[in-house]
């Protein structure tokens, strides 16, 4: 969207993801290779998050698949990373990474304190869902990639849950749907 305003720092809790058009943030087994082919970013995309992010909060399953905290935003961002887990004792230590065994609300409090007035990015579908249900997500920052995965890890999956209505930030009508139009890429 050309009218999309850049992210700003302000001590917000952001649920931040790139998602396939069919709602997956990762393929099966947290596979992320789909993001490395045929997907481009708008200019300045990475830099705005590097500048506004004070801390990262993620989950253990994602961490175990990608345990390189130094590679957040291609290595351009440095700061505290918090990994929420029920078993911190068997986690492999890493620089700037703290493994937490606590409630999600406590994890957010810890991350916000460490973020020093900047934003906390939540990079876990499950943790994000729990925080959203508790009213602890300030914004959902979502980037829709022009790809259909068909299987994998959904951004939001809460079978039997109630709908959660959202307001679009910066829109004249915050309840308006977002229209996108794609065509299949040539093989």
Question: What residue spans do the PLM features occupy?
Answer:
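Enzymes that bind and transform nitrogen-containing heteroaromatic metabolites
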Residues: 1-187
């Amino acid at each position: 969207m050309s009218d999309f305003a850049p992210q700003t720092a302000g001590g917000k809790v952001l649920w931040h993801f790139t998602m396939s058009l069919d709602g997956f943030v990762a393929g099966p087994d947290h596979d992320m290779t789909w993001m490395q082919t045929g997907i481009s970013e708008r200019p300045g995309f990475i830099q705005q998050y590097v500048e506004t992010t004070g801390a990262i909060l993620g989950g253990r399953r994602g961490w175990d698949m990608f345990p390189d905290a130094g590679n957040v935003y291609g290595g351009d961002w440095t700061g505290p990373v918090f990994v929420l887990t029920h078993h911190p004792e068997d986690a492999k230590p890493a620089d700037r990474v703290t493994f937490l065994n606590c409630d999600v609300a406590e994890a957010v409090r810890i991350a916000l304190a460490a973020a020093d007035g900047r934003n906390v990015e939540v990079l876990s579908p499950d943790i994000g869902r729990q925080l959203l249900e508790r009213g602890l997500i300030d914004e959902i920052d979502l980037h829709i990639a022009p790809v259909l995965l068909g299987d994998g890890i959904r951004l939001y999956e809460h079978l039997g849950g109630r709908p959660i209505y959202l307001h679009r930030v910066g829109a004249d009508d915050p309840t308006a749907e977002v229209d996108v139009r794609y065509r299949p890429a040539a093989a």
